[in-house]
Amino acid sequence: MFKNKHIVVGICGGIAAFKAAGLVSRLRQQGGDVHCIMTKNATKLVTPITFGELSGNNVTVDMFSNIYKWDVEHIALANLADIFVIAPATADIIGKVANGIADDMLSTTIMATKAKVLFVPSMNTNMYENPIVCQNIRKLRDLGYEFVEPESGHLACNTNGKGRFPELDKIIFQMQRILYGRHLLKGKNVVISAGGTKENIDPVRYIGNRSSGRMGYAIAKAAAMEDANVTLVSCTKSLPVPDGINVVYVENARELNTSMNLYYDSSDVIIMAAAVADYRPVNQSDHKIKKEENSSLDIKLELNPDILLELGKRKKKQFLVGFAAETNAVIRHGQEKIKKKNLDMLIANDVAMPGAGFNVTTNIASILYKDGTMQQYPKMTKEELGKIIIEKVAERL
């Protein structure tokens, strides 16, 4: 993931400094050449030896340690870096950089680099919400510096609020976006549905399908990577949501229909990756149906709304993408669906094939277009396919 990338991690003297050890370890495991700069206060919380062992490189603290041979050290690291990650970023380092202060190894190196800098603030809630800190963050954002928002929860100061060090996956996602994103969908509003709807029979049982939601989440991540404004309408709560994505949770087809229509007019791209139940029970019991009371059970069903069909009828400027999970005549059924539902693009796959379809991490797909052209792809991970789908959408906008 970070092969051949030179990553400089700045560790400041916040209580979350120990969590940076996990970040450094992950980055190295994923192929990164990781170099650590610690402030003197950070060394009072975690020893430089820890970060040296985890990174496989010398750790810099002192301005004049001459670790990097003949080169002026802060310039050597500044020139080496493909990306800087300041984690945890304290109010002190944010204030220094925002106001041009370079008085230690970390602040001096940040000032000297032309690489992208990603701040990961972590501090007491009152400090984070202090107007001066907020002003400094806004100033840095305006200057092109990037931030990962801290999380809310229980803090080391025994209070609850915003300021917790974020999950490593969120930091790594933002690093990927900065390093590999091409801004293909910058400024575009993309709405993606994911997962399988559930139609209640009673409070315990439901009619559903085998969709895990992984494909929709992979597409959402790929769209966010390309700087889209992503809204993910999700029928599942079991998957982690990538950073920077607005998620709306729904359960059944009617709720999904309401949400998709709510965001439709303001969207540039709609991708219907959710697996929607065609039918729902006419009557839903408000209590668990006991088998002792029913020797047999007949459930009368009625049609759910055809969400994709209705979105196709409403289409104006939107680029509309659908999915077709089939077990035979996949291409023919896909071509028919494009015409019937007024789609611009459709991802078709044979869910009967091993390694394709529901509840697996891979997929085998064909991408069909309204002009009659198509592209077929071999078995790949859903994340890889998600990137391809977003690239193809961007090409045709």
Model regions and ranges:
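A cross-family phosphate/adenosyl-ligand binding-site feature
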Residues: 1-119, 124-213, 217-397
